[in-house]
Amino acid sequence: MNIFVTHPDPLKSAVVLPDKHVVKMPLETTQMVSLLFSPWYYDWGKVLKKDGTPYDTTKGAFRNHPCTKWAAESMYNTAWLIQHGCSLVHEYWYRYGKIHACAKPLFEAKKIFHTMTGEIILCYCMVESFTRAMPNELKHNTSIDTFTAYKTYLASKPWVASNYLRDPSRKPDWI
C-alpha cells in the first residue's frame, strides 16, 4: 500500500510509473478510497467493485497506513488520490488496451466526492504536502523534496529499469 508521488500532478505522477505499478496501484488506490468513504473516515458510502459488490472495509485494514492517513487529512488530498487512481487506470488502458477492473469504482468515487463536497476533483491542486512511505533514509531526508524522494525510491529498485516494456518512452530519465 503506497502512493508513488513523483510529481504534484496526479496524471504526470501516474504516467512515469513502471508497468508493474500501473497494474497493481489502481487496486491499492481503490482500497484506500473505499476506506476513506467508509465509517472509518468520511462515511460517504460504499465503493462498489466492477461486479457490484462493495469493497470490504469492516476491519479497516490499512486505516493507519501513512498514505491512508494523509489522504484523509483534507478533501484536497482525497481528491488528489482519486484523480491519481483515475490517471492510473487511464495509463493501464493506454499501455494494455484493456479497461482496469478499478476504473468504474474510481470514476464513481469521483462522482461521490463531488456530491459530498461540492468541489470538483481539480481541487487536488490545493494539496500542500505529501507523506513519505519509504525507507527512513529517504523518509527523513530533508535535503530533497518528496517528489525526488519517491523518484529515488523507485529508481533504487533493480527491477524498475527494465519494467517499461509496454511503452519504453514512458520510462523517465531519472530511472
Where are these regions (language model features)?
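An N-terminal structural lobe/cap that precedes and organizes the functional/catalytic core
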Residues: 1-100
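Phosphate/pyrophosphate-binding catalytic cores of soluble transferases and nucleic-acid-acting enzymes
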Residues: 84, 107, 121-122
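Aromatic-residue-lined binding/catalytic grooves and analogous aromatic/hydrophobic interfacial grooves
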Residues: 112-175
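Primarily interfacial, aromatic-capped hydrophobic alpha-helices that serve as membrane anchors
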Residues: 100, 107-113
